[in-house]
Amino acid sequence: MWSLWSLLLFEALLPVVVVSVQVLSKVGDSELLVAECPPGFQVREAIWRSLWPSEELLATFFRGSLETLYHSRFLGRVQLYDNLSLELGPLKPGDSGNFSVLMVDTGGQTWTQTLYLKVYDAVPKPEVQVFTAAAEETQPLNTCQVFLSCWAPNISDITYSWRWEGTVDFNGEVRSHFSNGQVLSVSLGLGDKDVAFTCIASNPVSWDMTTVTPWESCHHEAASGKASYKDVLLVVVPITLFLILAGLFGAWHHGLCSGKKKDACTDGVLPETENALV
């Protein structure tokens, strides 16, 4: 206990040299916080602390003894090595923060190193949705305007980028929307049926990607003189229904006329029969 208080007293009263370092890692990994000191600095005592979001004692080195069994949110996830570097892990989403190691040499000189640890989530496989824009009068024939939306669920600090491949001479119009490149608008032509677009979602420590072929969502065929199956249905089905209805109407009308003629014939025969009887 006296060693701990003496180290804190050194930090408060003696000149301290501070070196700051940024460390990036991801959830589930272990990260080594390396303790570095000047050449010839022979460490006699050292103390590792978490400074933010809460100040906690993590590990100490005193008289050649390493100690890590201090009550903190890292209890059971801390290992202090002989070179005084501290390993934390497996890391959790709330482990980001500021850490410091205070070292005192055999002559009483102090050296402090602060480290900022940023823990990112691992990037999941992004989801890509394809939306087809309604055709406009000014839109060239046999082209398809699509919007590609990329999204990595349940994660922040993500940037998006796109790449495409498939047609060597692809020269369709491509525009990126939003500052993080999450939405892409693409104009496709008949020669771009096989062009595949890949969305890459990434953060500083991990990435993943998803590939789609947007022409499959355009729902039309190349205009090469052949009618598509959809176009055929649009013509054949109405004509067939019209012919069926016309046939039904003709049959009904024929039956109606036949009934009227039969009644007329019956009216003409009855008087003659009556006269013959008389």
From Swiss-Prot:
Positions of transmembrane segments: 232-252
Gene Ontology BP annotations: B-1 B cell lineage commitment; cellular response to xenobiotic stimulus; defense response to bacterium; leukocyte chemotaxis involved in inflammatory response; negative regulation of dendritic cell chemotaxis; negative regulation of macrophage chemotaxis; negative regulation of monocyte chemotaxis; negative regulation of neutrophil migration
Disulphide bridges, residue numbers: C150-C199
GO CC terms: membrane
Keyword Transmembrane helix: yes
Gene Ontology terms, MF aspect: identical protein binding; signaling receptor activity
Ranges in the topological domain labelled Extracellular: 21-231
Membrane topology listed for this record: Single-pass type I membrane protein
Main location class: membrane
Residue ranges annotated as Cytoplasmic topological domain: 253-278
Signal peptide: 1-20
Glycosylation sites: N83, N154
Localisation per UniProt entry: Membrane
Keywords on record: Disulfide bond, Glycoprotein, Immunoglobulin domain, Membrane, Signal, Transmembrane, Transmembrane helix
SUPFAM superfamilies in UniProt: Immunoglobulin
Domain Ig-like C2-type: 126-213
Role: May play a role in B-lineage commitment and/or modulation of signaling through the B-cell receptor.
Protein name: SLAM family member 8
Source species of the chain: Mus musculus (Mouse)
Source lineage: Eukaryota, Metazoa, Chordata, Craniata, Vertebrata
Encoding gene (name): Slamf8
